Amino acid sequence: SRLARRGSGSATRSIFGGAVIWHRGHDDASSFAEPLAIQPSLPLRMLVVTVSAEKKAVSSRKGMANTVATSPYYDAWVASNESLIEPMITALAEDDLALIGKLTELSSMRMHAAIMAEEPPFTYFLPETLRAWQLVQEQRALGIPAFATMDAGPNVKILTTEPYVDILLTALRPVFGDRILSTRLGPDASIITKEQFDDTKSAIASQG
């Protein structure tokens, strides 16, 4: 995970399967990821809504570097995010989807608040980004457990569980069509053959 981190923070978390914690650390040796001791048993699913497949006008690396350097909210976001870690570990261990979702949304939106406050002001949000968030909130108001999150980009990921995937797809497709990918917690990273890759790609493409 340390080697993967040098390419991407997201890659750090993707080396291991299941729910993973990335230790911030203070140098190369202490900044690494590892699986959580207690994994959730919930049938977690994530719907990835592709708002835009275009190259980002500002790369994640450049955008976040400028956030660190110029946003007055950056330090507050880091402190806030660190305060969410232990509650999230507990929520995952206790299969508390409502709390998992709440903490996920808080972390994501506070990060984007810090990004918007950088100099010069900037946002990754597009009009359809906001529409996706609105749809999630509308579904949650109807009693559907759905929670939105984003990384440094315009696309929206929606956390839910298996029984509600079709309901959410029905709500999302009139706006986003086939730009929705349904995923779940994956296994450890591994080396696969081209045939295995093609089979996996086909299986993903065939998902509802």
Segment roles from a protein language model:
Residues S1-P43, G208:
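Gly/Ser-rich oxyanion-binding loop with an adjacent helix/lid
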Residues L36-G208:
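C-terminal nucleotide
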